[in-house]
Amino acid sequence: MIIIVCGSDDTDKSYISTNMKKTMKALVYEEYTTDDDFSKILKIKDLPIPEPKSNEIVFKVKAAALNYDDIWGMRGKPLAIPLPHISGTDAAGEVTAVGEDVKNFKVGDRVVSHGNMSCRVCKRCTSGREYDCKKRTIWGFETGPLWGGYCEYTHLPEVNVVKIPEGVSYEEAAAASMTMLTSWHMLVGRAKIQPGQLVLIMGGGSGVGNYGIQIAKLFGCTVIATASPDKLDQLLELGADYAIDHRKDDWHKEVRAIAKKIPKAYGDTPGVDVIFEHIGGSHWNKELTLLNYGGTVITTGATTGYMAKTDLRHIFFKGLNILGSTQGTRAELEQGFYWMSKGKIKSIIDSEYTLEQAAEAHTKMLKGKGLFGKIIMKPS
C-alpha cells in the first residue's frame, strides 16, 4: 500500500506503508491482578495495525524489554493505568510507515523508543528537563488504552524514537532504551561523575546496575558494585573493580575497608564519592555513612522499600548531596547509544521470551532469582 499526501510546497509529503496485513497480535490485559498471577490476565489479541498520525512513525517490533513498571501496571498500583492495556516501554524495530510531517525517519530505518513522553513546549521541556514536565507520561505504562510495545506493530511520535546505530542489535537497543538512559542520566546528567572518583553501584546485577558499572568505568572511575553472592563474579567480568555481597549485614564495612585502601589521587579523605542507589529500604543509612565529605547519593528507585529512615547528621555534618532522578532526555539516550556503537557499553541480556510466554517472563523478573541483565520479549 502506497499513500501520497501532497504538501503546500513544491516537495511532496508522503508516507509509505509496507503493512500488508490488516491485523496484528498484541499482548493485552483488561483487568488488574491482585495476586501477581499474570497468566490470569495476559491474553494474546488480534488488533488493527496502527496507521501513523501526521507526526508519527509506525514500526514493526523486533524486540521489547521488560521493566518493573509492567508489574505495577498489571497490579493497577501505584497508578490505575488505562484498560484495556498493552504494556512495553522499550521497543525496537523497523519503520514501516511515516506520517506526512515526519522529517527525520523513513521506511526501513532501525529505531528504538524513547518512552518519556512530554509536552515539549513548557519551560521545563525547553530548558532540557523534559523528564520533569508536568504532563509527562511513560509510554507503555501510563499511555492507552492499547498503546505500548508488546505487539507486532506500534506507533510513536517522531520525537519519541531514536535511530539505532550500526553494530547495535534490536535486542541490545530495546534492553538499553529506558535502563541505560536512566543510568546515564543518574551518573552523568545528575551526579556529574568525574575521572578518579570512587563510585558505589548498588544492585549491580540489575539492568540499571549493569549499565551503571559500565558508564562509571567509561568515565575513568573506580567502581565498587554490590549484588547477591551468585552474581559477584559477573560484576567483575562487567568491569567492576570490587564486588560486595550486599545481603550481608556488615556489607558496608567491607566497602569502607576498600575505600580506605584506595589511593586518593583527587583528595585526602577516604570515602565513596558517588553512590548509585535504587534499592532503598534498610541499606539507606549504611550508604550515607560511606560517603566522603561533599559526596553524592543519586537515587532512582526503592525496590526494597520506600520508607527509609535517615540519620540527618550524616547529611549536614559531611555536606552530602542527595539527588533524585527519573529517566533522562532524548539527547542523553543518543549519547549512550553512541558509546554502545563504539563497543564501550553493552547490553546484558538475561533471557528471551515470546509474547505467548509473557507471564513466565514477568514472573521471572518479579522473583529476580538468578536474574542478571534484561529480559527480552519478541512478537515472533
At which residue positions do the language-model features occur?
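Glycine-rich beta-strand-centered segment in the early N-terminal region that forms part
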Residues: 48-65, 77-126, 147, 165-168
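NAD(P)H dinucleotide-binding glycine-rich loop of Rossmann-like/cofactor-binding domains
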Residues: 117-203
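C-terminal hydrophobic helical "lid"/dimerization subdomain
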Residues: 21-22, 330-380
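Glycine-rich cofactor phosphate-binding loops and adjacent beta1-alpha1 units
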Residues: 224-227, 234-321
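Mid-domain Rossmann-like dinucleotide-binding core that forms the NAD(H)/NADP(H) cofactor-binding site
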Residues: 168-249
